[in-house]
Amino acid sequence: FSRILSKNGKVIIAVPNHKSWDAKHYKEFWAAWDVPIHLWHFSKDTIEKLFSKHNFKLIKTKPMLFDSFYVALLSEEFKTAKKKFISGFIIGIISNTIGMLTKKGCSSTIYIFEKKN
């Protein structure tokens, strides 16, 4: 990215968070494992280290609050072979609440990076 990004450009990337509460809750049924689409999974620390190695600094993170509900709904279906809207909704609320109150983070996070000076 560094070569093609303008001087004040930003890199915006959204990734699932394998350290989130819902990832631990659903384990192998967590829908955001999503192989082969997601080949690697990152926490805040690991994605920050990766971009830092390539001369970028993290300037902001944002939780993808609605993604927790979607991932929970899909995970419920993977786990039980049934669409469980209420369970998925409740798990989404729990995951977002824990993610916002702890350092675990939400199910998915948006990271905004810029070049280091």
Feature map (PLM): residue ranges:
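S-adenosyl-L-methionine-dependent methyltransferase catalytic module, highlighting the catalytic core
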Residues: 4, 10-114
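Class I S-adenosylmethionine-dependent transferase superfamily signal
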Residues: 1
